[in-house]
Design a protein with these regions (language model features):
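Positively charged, low-complexity terminal tracts
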Residues: 1-117
Length: 117
């Protein structure tokens, strides 16, 4: 599945656009698939912030706010917000409640007990 990601950086009026390609179609997504998509969104955000930097080797799903929201043209989008930027990916042909549950499980599974930052 190809997902368009629109990235908005704080203090910058330009909207950056990236494409994420994920091999699994949404109907078969697991929390692991959604975690991979969320991490790809965060890597795309890092690239927009500093195009010359190498991609982050490790990305953790914490310190961000997220929401699943209906898309104007059908389906839903995943929106992430971190301190310095926000990103929206989609649309995804899936019920909002289903994707919300997958995101919740993906973020919970990525938590590492005992690790603060």
């Amino acid at each position: 599945m190809r997902l368009t990601v629109e990235i908005m950086l704080r203090g910058n009026n330009h909207v950056f656009t990236e494409t994420i390609v994920h091999p699994t179609e949404p109907a078969a997504w697991t929390p692991e698939d959604v975690a991979a998509i969320l991490k790809a969104m965060l890597r795309a955000t890092a690239k927009a912030q500093d195009p010359a930097a190498p991609p982050p080797a490790e990305v953790q799903l914490r310190g961000m706010n997220w929401i699943v929201h209906p898309a104007a043209d059908g389906g839903v989008v995943i929106a992430l917000e971190i301190h310095t930027a926000s990103a929206v990916a989609g649309p995804v042909p899936m019920a909002a409640a289903t994707l919300e549950a997958l995101v919740t499980r993906a973020v919970a599974a990525d938590a590492r007990p005992g690790v603060v930052h």
